[in-house]
């Protein structure tokens, strides 16, 4: 599985992915700072899908950083990255699925089609990005393939989207 962005902190990014086992109790976390200034990260463990205390190891320096409760706090120098192994006792279900995490069959990052599906920065959104130019044809959709619920059942879902005049949102849940 590919890592995905779970948080933006100032100019930095927090990426996460399962390692060792899908939906397991060990995850890799990357704190990436592409900016010209140091970046202080404060990442709630719930954003990493953990509850309680976790053990943290710096995978680049091969060093244990101890136990963390509540939030992971690290400072990353300018143009730097920190790759961590996080191990917890209790993995929790995700509560947010960002547009940027969706599978987009017609995504085109080459820029050849001016109306192709694309990611666009937008302040005020939870992930600081939106997916634009969806729709117009049946194969131009967004699909979240890794939605997870341990027990299933009924859930309340909130969808936030922007639209132009005369457009609609169609939602299918299996």
Question: Can you name each region flagged by the protein language model?
Answer:
Residues 1-35, 115-128:
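Glycan-recognition and catalytic regions of carbohydrate-active enzymes
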Residues 12, 25-27, 39-41, 52, ...:
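Structural beta-strand/beta-sheet cores of well-ordered domains, especially the beta-sheet scaffolds
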Residues 21, 34-37, 61, 89-90:
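Short, glycine-/Ser/Thr-/acidic-enriched flexible segments
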Residues 32-34, 46, 59, 162:
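Short, loop-centered acidic/histidine patches that primarily coordinate divalent metals
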Residues 34-50:
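Surface-exposed beta-strand/loop patches in extracellular or lumenal glycoproteins
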């Amino acid at each position: 599985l590919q890592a995905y962005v779970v948080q933006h902190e100032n100019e930095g990014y927090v990426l996460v992915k399962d390692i060792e086992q899908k939906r397991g109790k060990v995850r890799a976390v990357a704190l990436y700072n592409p900016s010209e200034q140091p970046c202080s990260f404060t990442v709630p463990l719930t954003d990493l899908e953990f509850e309680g205390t976790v053990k943290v190891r710096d995978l680049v320096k091969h060093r244990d950083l101890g136990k963390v409760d509540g939030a992971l706090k690290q400072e990353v120098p300018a143009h730097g990255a920190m790759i961590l192994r996080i191990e917890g006792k209790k993995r929790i279900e995700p509560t947010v699925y960002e547009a940027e995490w969706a599978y987009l069959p017609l995504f085109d990052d080459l820029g050849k089609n001016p109306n192709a599906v694309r990611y666009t920065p937008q302040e005020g959104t939870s992930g600081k990005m939106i997916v634009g130019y969806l729709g117009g044809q049946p194969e131009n959709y967004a699909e979240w393939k890794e939605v997870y619920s341990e027990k299933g059942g009924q859930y309340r879902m909130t969808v936030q989207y922007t639209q132009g005049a005369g457009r609609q949102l169609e939602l299918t849940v299996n």
